[in-house]
UniProtKB/Swiss-Prot annotation:
CDD domains according to UniProt: QFR_TypeD_subunitC
Protein name: Fumarate reductase subunit C
Subunit composition and interactions: Part of an enzyme complex containing four subunits: a flavoprotein (FrdA), an iron-sulfur protein (FrdB), and two hydrophobic anchor proteins (FrdC and FrdD).
Compartments, as annotated in UniProt: Cell inner membrane
Family the UniProt entry places it in: Belongs to the FrdC family.
Protein's organism: Shigella boydii serotype 4 (strain Sb227)
Amino acid sequence: MTTKRKPYVRPMTSTWWKKLPFYRFYMLREGTAVPAVWFSIELIFGLFALKNGPDAWAGFVDFLQNPVIVIINLITLAAALLHTKTWFELAPKAANIIVKDEKMGPEPIIKSLWAVTVVATIVILFVALYW
């Protein structure tokens, strides 16, 4: 049996996300995927350049020294830091940690995640620069 009734479909404009600051920040956070894709492609090209010998690697390093690429990489770094910040703020909401019959607040978890990130960054930089 078919019906002639038309269901109500609420109109949705293409600018729905511009109405509230929460939605704008949501779109910004989701947009951090684009710089992540850029960095992934750049890293893959770097690996292929490393595999193809010193001349290819020198060309890749020259490419990285282009001022436009430096600016794009700084934007990518900012996007990665924003994504990391929002992810670390989300992590305590997913973990229900109880210490001495009280639920632990989000601050210790967020601070420990940042501490691990800083330590890992320092170790990686030390190995890359001085090993």
